[in-house]
Amino acid sequence: MTDSNNWYIEHFERTGSAIGYRITGKLDEVQSPFQKIEIFRTTDWGNLMTIDGAIMLTSKDNFFYHEMISHPVLFTHAAPKRVVIIGGGDCGTLREVLKHKGVESVTQCDIDEQVTVMARKHFPELCDSNDDARAELLFDDGVAYMANCPAGSVDVVIVDSTDPVGPGEGLFNKAFYASCFKALKDDGILVQQSESPLMQLELINEMRTEMGKAGFGSFKTLPFPQPCYPTGWWSVTLARKGESSFDFRQADSAAKTFETLYYTAALHTGVLVTPPFVQAALK
């Protein structure tokens, strides 16, 4: 919500906290069949996107999330060639995945085309790989897409979803994870944004439990900073179909030729060390 002093403030009842940005005005808004998308100009954080009032990203800090949902999983897989992104309509994750030249094809399936339309207009830097020949952008139900995905056809599934409410609700249960499990090859990996490890460990445990019911045998939750999300600390959770190790191709990561603003091989090594309070709470 905006107040009379030109601040956009989102209150988080479940964490008893709030995040605010000083704004100079609203740049755009659209009511899609699924949700309301708004774009604001801030004084210090670039453009701000909200969906149904919830802060999604800013120009200044989205790289933390997009890099950490993409590069750790792709360097953990031995040779990822076929990638599916469920959600991801702002296209920042797609851009990061396509930095990996060994990836041969990426299908992104987001239910709401208007998210991508607004991203192209107001976050063009996130969409500069949308026309890559390896990319396929679909605007459809991600749950249905994964249910119909051929068995054993995918190396990595990235679930770049909103919170588990509204359009994103169906992406956090056993049935959806079972579809991902079926679609993945024997050495395939699923990764999904998994909320704040400081305040939402119960949700992370629920996700891991549902993933386990779907057949996944090992999990790793990686925390990272994300200033625009509740608590400023976020996470992604990886689930392996086959082997249990989350070792990564450290030499390849260290020798990467593309630019990142946060992710490095050294950082990847460090983030594999789970903080004691998180480890104690995880099942």
Curated annotation (Swiss-Prot):
Spermidine binds at H66, D90, D160, S161, T162, D163. It is an enzyme of class 2 (transferase). The active site is at D160. Keywords: Cytoplasm, Polyamine biosynthesis, Spermidine biosynthesis, Transferase. Residues 5-241 form the PABS domain. Pathway: Amine and polyamine biosynthesis; spermidine biosynthesis; spermidine from putrescine: step 1/1. Its EC number is 2.5.1.16. One of its GO terms (molecular function) is spermidine synthase activity. Homodimer or homotetramer. This is Polyamine aminopropyltransferase. It comes from Stenotrophomonas maltophilia (strain R551-3).
